[in-house]
Amino acid sequence: MKFVNDGGALAFSHRGEQVRIESWGRDALRVRATRGREFSGHDWALTEPVEPAPAQIVIEETEFRDGDGSFVRRERASITNGRIRAEVNHAGVLSFFRDGSLILREHFRDYDGAISRESRCLKLAAREWKGLPGGSEYQLKVRFESGKGEKIFGMGQYQDDCMDKKGCLLELAQRNSQISIPFALSSLGYGFLWNNPAVGQAVFGSNYYEWTALSTREMDYWITAAGSPRDVLERYTAVTGRAEMFPEDLMGLWQCKLRYRTQEEVLAVARKYREEGIKLDQIVIDFFHWTVQGDWRFDETYWPDPKAMVDELHAMGVKVVVSVWPTVDRRSENFVPLLDRGLLMRTERGALQTYDYEGDCVELDAFHPEARQ
C-alpha cells in the first residue's frame, strides 16, 4: 500500500478501495472511500464553502511485526489540521486524535495489520463493502471502537427517552414523528457527521460503533475536534450551514387539531381566543382539507372561501399553517400531468409504487428539480 500527498489531501489505495482524507474547515477532516474508479464529487450535507486549511501530512516507514513473527518495514501516514490528527497504519486502519489524545479509532479485527490484536480471527473489516446485485452500489458498514465512558449526544429526534445515545440502535431514515440527523456529539470532544444520504442505521454499542448505509457508491464522513460542545457545534454549522433565528411569532402559541373539518371551525377557534384575550400566533389546518390527495386545493364544499378566511385570521394577527402532502391520488386532476412529465416516484425497476391510504396513491418526487417548483 502506498500513501501519497494528493494536493494537500492524504490518499491511498488498498485492496480495491480508494481512500481520501482532507482538511474541511477548522480543526476538521473529511474522509471518503470508494470501490469505484473515482469519487462522485457530491458534497451532500457539506453545503458551505470553506476556506482552504493547509494540512500537515507525514508519510514515513516504520517497523511492523508480521504475522509470522518477523519484522518488516511498511509505510504509515498522518494528516493534521489544527487540533485534529488522523493516523493511518500500513493496512489502512484509521485513528483520530485531539491534541495528541486518542478520541476515535476504527474497529478492525483481521490479520492484515490490526492495531488491536484481540479476536483477529473474526476477520472484521473497519470498512465493509457488500456489492448489491445488478448495479454499482454497495451496502456499507463502517465500524469504530467504543470509547470507555464515552457519551454520545445528538442524532436528531427519536421516539425514545435516551439523551445519551450510547447503547442505542438508531434508524437513519425520516418517518412521521422521527427526524434523523446523523451528527453525533461525543463527550470525548469530537463531532462526527455521517455524510451519506442513504437509509441505514447507527449503532452505538458498548463493544463497537457501526454505521450502515443500505445502498451507496461511496463512504463519506466528516469529523472535528474541539475543546467544548459549543466549539464542536460552531465548526459543524460552519460547514453545513446555520439556521436563521426563528421569527418571534413562530416561538409563540400554536393551535392545532387533528383535524379542522371546515372553514367555520377554524374561524370559530380563532375568534374564541380573541374573546378570551389570548394572543394566538399560528393556527394549523391539517390534512384532508383537500378534495383528493394531489389536488392541493381546498374542498369548496367545506372551505367555500379560503381567501376570506385567511384575511380574517391575518386581521386578528394569526398566521395560517396549511399541511401539504406529497401524495397524489390516481383520481387527482394532477396525476396524469405529473406522470407524463416523470415527476412521480418510481421503484428501481421503473414501476410506480402505489399504496392504499384514503385512495390509491403515489408520491411526488421531491428530488426532481421541476417537481420542487
Pin down the residues of each PLM region.
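Short secondary-structure boundary/capping segments
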Residues: E38, A270, R297-Y302, F335-R341
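Short acidic, glycine/serine/threonine-rich loops at helix termini
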Residues: F204-S206, G294-R297, R331-P337
